[in-house]
């Protein structure tokens, strides 16, 4: 677990727990928003629900993902209180309307050097079928941190980053896959008519 102040950028927190060798190879936070590089962990807890990593680790409010939140209450004589267990839900996803989050404790897992992968499909339906089966397989035969179906109309927005790896005539599934499970991932991709572009 890691205890941190609410104002730390999620990207900085992730870098710190990966660098800390309390666990050989470092650790990683369980989930983060797509705005990881500019978002604070306190903002994510106050307004977030899920994100990259949720397909593997659940959502923020699931028991044990956040184990402590320290809050300054919004009352005439503010108090500093620490919430644990089910009491965390009193301020999680409340957008700061009932207290100011100043610190929190998050559960961690051993870090994995996730493989960023793009699978291309002839139809969005094929991409969704693949994504659904891959999601169901998590925990039994596949380990993935992210599985996101992306419709072809979005492809032009990725040209600068991905070039021809996401062409406008294909639908895609963006994913982060455990390298130890990549061969099984590729078998499942082929089963659904997908091709690997990254």
Each predicted region: which residue ranges?
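Noncatalytic alpha-helical scaffold of FAD-dependent oxidoreductases
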Residues: 1-198
